[in-house]
């Protein structure tokens, strides 16, 4: 897998968050993050170009972004594109995909085991990251799909 990171400046139209193209047996995935518009109406963004054999999954893309230290630059437009391209069905699935960008299931279990043995720091870090992922995922789906708002909606019906 070959990954090239660049900063694009002075684009006249807003870049598409995720672009996939194919050449022979290779997939080239271009990810545009941190899109901003200047006063002249031109766009700037961080771009990751990934060339690889086969196809990347949504989790693979999030892992690459996290590995490059760009997780904080993920925005709603990017997530909506990810949801559309990979047919992510709901809030819970998207939140899980986002969490998997940084933690594997065994790593999550390890955080819980350490907490049981008295070391709360890894679990505190995991929980903070999960909350961040939940907030991002909630931006792509109706508020009624999020766990915090389910209880609020049930109480309104009473």
Language-model features, listed with the residues they occupy:
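A preference for well-ordered globular domain cores
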Residues: 1-158
